[in-house]
């Protein structure tokens, strides 16, 4: 098993020193979904939810979530994010919305946590905007599907591992 780098020799949590690492282009993609009834999904697709444009607001919330990651996750480094894209796609087969967040930087550490935070923040926002219509929505499947750049190289989630 790999050594956990967020603990010092005494077992105390600390922020990893990345100052000796090379600056490289990095990307991470995370996805998740939010399941809901077909009636609630209709509100999203027809733009008739009481709180307004569910997908547009959730997209902005996801972008903001990526930018605030270091404020939320104690040992994350504040990073110079160069791109955040959050895609929300209604999917009648769930039924619900599939969410994909892509984050890029040129830096000394990866952006996996920023991508995960963007996707989860977008999903939470969808829930918030629709909870008056349905309280049984389910958020799930949050995972990194792509990570590239840095010393550890490229990771891609196996095909067919998504719900």
Swiss-Prot record:
Active site: 128
Pfam families: MoaC
Keywords noted in UniProt: Lyase, Molybdenum cofactor biosynthesis
Source organism, top-level taxon: Bacteria
Single GO biological process annotation from the record: Mo-molybdopterin cofactor biosynthetic process
Pathway: Cofactor biosynthesis; molybdopterin biosynthesis
Binding site for substrate: 75-77, 113-114
Listed transmembrane segments: none
Catalytic reaction list: (8S)-3',8-cyclo-7,8-dihydroguanosine 5'-triphosphate = cyclic pyranopterin phosphate + diphosphate
Gene3D superfamilies per UniProt: Molybdopterin cofactor biosynthesis C (MoaC) domain
Matches recorded under InterPro entries: MoaC, MoaC_bact/euk, MoaC_sf, MoCo_biosynth_MoaA/MoaC, Mopterin_CF_biosynth-C_dom
Enzyme class, UniProt record, top EC level: lyase
EC number(s) on file: 4.6.1.17
Annotated GO MF terms: cyclic pyranopterin monophosphate synthase activity
Claim: RNA-binding is one of the keywords in the record: no
Similarity comment text for this entry: Belongs to the MoaC family.
NCBIfam families listed in its UniProt record: moaC, PRK09364.1
Subunit structure of this chain's protein: Homohexamer; trimer of dimers.
Function: Catalyzes the conversion of (8S)-3',8-cyclo-7,8-dihydroguanosine 5'-triphosphate to cyclic pyranopterin monophosphate (cPMP).
Protein name per UniProt: Cyclic pyranopterin monophosphate synthase
Organism: Jannaschia sp. (strain CCS1)
Gene encoding the protein: moaC
